[in-house]
C-alpha cells in the first residue's frame, strides 16, 4: 500500500491514454491522481506513480530528461538541440575496494588493522559521517594508501573519483572528474521534494544532496539537476566561493537557503558535525528563499569577509 489505508482489491485505479500523447491516472479508492502532457515536465505526482508501479529511478530520470528535451526543442527550434550528457566509465586507483567490505581488516596487514585504513575511518567519523553513508573506498596499495576515495557514479557506473589526503600532505585532493558531472545525482530518488545543491562531495553526502564540484554551475550540470523536476535549493558555503555559487542559483532561477548558523559554521558539513543531521536539514528547509530580491538582500549579510 503506497497511498491510502488499504490496498484496492476492486481495480478502481484507471489509466487513460489519449491520442495527443496525454496520460492520466485516477485511483477511485484513495483519490490519487497524476497526469503527463507532452511538452510539459513530468510532475512530482507522476514520478511518484511511476515509482509505485515499479519503474526504476534511473528510468524515471531518463524519462524526465526526455521530457525536458521536448520542452527545450519546442520552445525555440533555432537553438542548439539538447543533448543528454554522457560520461565515460573510469577505473578507480589500483586495489580500491569499499570500506564496508573490509570486514577482515586483520588480513590486510600481518600486524593487524592498517593505520591508513584506520585513519580513513577516523576521518569520516570526525566529519560526522558513518562508513555506510556512502560507498567510500580505500586501497592498501601505492600513494593512494593514505587517502579516502570517494567514487563518482552516474547511472550506476563509476565515472570518476576524488581521493582526500588523510592527515598532512599535499595535494589535499586528487580528483578525476569529467566536464558537466554532478556528484550524487544517482541517489536523488523520485519521491523527494527538494534537491539540495552544494559545492563539495562531503557536504553533499552530509545532507544527501548533489555537488557541482566547483563554485560555477555549468549549463550541462544545470540541465541534469533540472531534470529531477523538483525544487532546486542551493546551500552555499559562507565564503567567496559560496557567494559565486549563489550567483549561479540566481542565473538558473533556483532557490537558496540561508540557515542561521553560529559564526563558526562555514558550510553544511560543519553544521552536521555541530548540530547533527536532522537539525541541520530542518534549518535548511526552514530557511529556503525563492524571491530573487530577498535572496540578494540576505546574501549581503550571510557571507563571511
Language-model regions: role of each:
Residues 122, 126, 141-231, 236, ...:
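Phosphate-handling DNA/RNA-contact segment within nucleic-acid enzymes
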Residues 226-229, 266-281:
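Short, surface-exposed amphipathic charged segments that create phosphate/polyanion-binding patches used
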Residues 255-267:
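A generic structural motif
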Residues 1-6, 44-149, 153-155, 190, ...:
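TOPRIM metal-binding catalytic domain and adjacent DNA-binding surface shared by DnaG-type primases
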Residues 1-49, 139-144, 260:
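N-terminal single-stranded DNA-binding subdomain of primase/primase-helicase replication proteins
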Residues 243-253:
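Short, aromatic/basic amphipathic alpha-helical patches
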Amino acid at each position: 500500500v503506497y497511498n491510502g489505508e488499504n490496498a484496492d482489491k476492486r481495480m478502481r485505479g484507471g489509466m487513460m491514454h489519449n491520442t495527443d500523447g496525454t496520460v492520466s491516472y485516477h485511483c477511485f479508492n484513495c483519490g490519487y491522481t497524476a497526469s503527463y502532457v507532452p511538452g510539459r515536465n513530468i510532475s512530482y505526482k507522476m514520478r511518484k506513480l511511476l515509482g509505485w508501479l515499479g519503474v526504476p529511478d534511473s528510468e524515471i530520470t531518463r524519462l524526465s530528461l526526455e521530457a525536458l528535451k521536448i520542452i527545450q526543442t519546442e520552445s525555440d527550434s533555432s537553438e542548439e538541440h539538447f543533448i543528454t550528457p554522457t560520461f565515460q566509465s573510469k577505473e578507480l586507483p589500483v586495489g580500491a575496494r569499499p570500506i564496508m567490505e573490509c570486514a577482515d581488516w586483520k588480513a590486510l596487514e600481518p600486524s593487524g588493522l592498517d593505520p591508513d585504513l584506520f585513519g580513513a575511518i577516523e576521518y569520516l567519523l570526525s566529519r560526522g559521517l558513518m562508513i555506510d553513508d556512502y560507498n567510500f573506498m580505500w586501497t592498501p596499495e601505492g600513494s593512494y594508501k593514505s587517502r579516502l576515495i570517494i567514487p563518482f557514479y552516474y547511472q550506476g557506473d563509476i565515472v570518476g573519483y576524488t581521493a582526500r589526503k588523510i592527515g598532512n600532505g599535499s595535494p589535499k585532493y586528487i580528483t578525476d572528474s569529467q566536464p558537466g558531472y554532478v556528484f550524487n545525482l544517482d541517489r536523488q530518488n523520485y519521491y523527494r521534494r527538494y534537491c539540495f545543491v552544494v559545492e563539495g562531495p562531503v557536504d553533499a553526502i552530509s545532507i544527501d544532496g548533489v555537488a557541482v564540484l566547483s563554485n560555477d554551475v555549468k549549463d550541462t550540470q544545470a540541465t541534469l539537476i533540472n531534470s529531477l523536476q523538483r525544487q532546486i535549493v542551493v546551500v552555499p558555503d559562507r565564503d567567496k566561493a559560496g557567494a559565486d555559487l549563489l550567483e549561479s542559483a540566481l542565473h538558473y532561477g533556483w532557490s537558496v537557503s540561508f540557515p542561521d548558523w553560529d559564526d563558526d559554521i562555514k558550510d553544511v558539513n560543519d553544521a552536521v558535525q555541530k548540530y547533527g543531521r536532522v537539525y541541520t536539514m530542518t534549518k535548511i528547509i526552514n530557511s529556503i528563499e525563492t524571491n530573487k530580491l530577498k535572496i540578494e538582500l540576505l546574501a549581503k549579510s550571510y557571507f563571511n569577509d
